């Protein structure tokens, strides 16, 4: 078995306006097919987790219908979840900004929690310690997710506000303990 499978729905130019949040249904279907292919790889590799991070969002007010994008995301995540075999999990990661700066479709842990709950029982939230607003209490987020049985895992890095993916403990070694 290997670790989690991380589908890439952001690098290809077809995703420049998003993947699951894209207003073009053909693009959303392509992203869904990529998820299904990733699940097939996950099953073949005997991996437990499908780890999802989306770059989807917008850079300027009025350029995206945020409610439609939320609905499309919910539909696509539900369709992805429906393809999971028993004992497999789908982890939904959030990020408040970057690459989009006006809005990201799954911007914080609350949005990820709602999306995961709407997706199905095998969906959980993935906490990346570099994906938070200034002064946000990550320990409190983890406690809430644990209490709701919705904590799926972590991506640890030591750059809390800009996601530079620094090695855990490189800035503040005491935070590891």
Model-based region annotation:
Residues 2-7, 13-124:
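Active-site acidic/histidine proton-transfer and metal-coordination neighborhood
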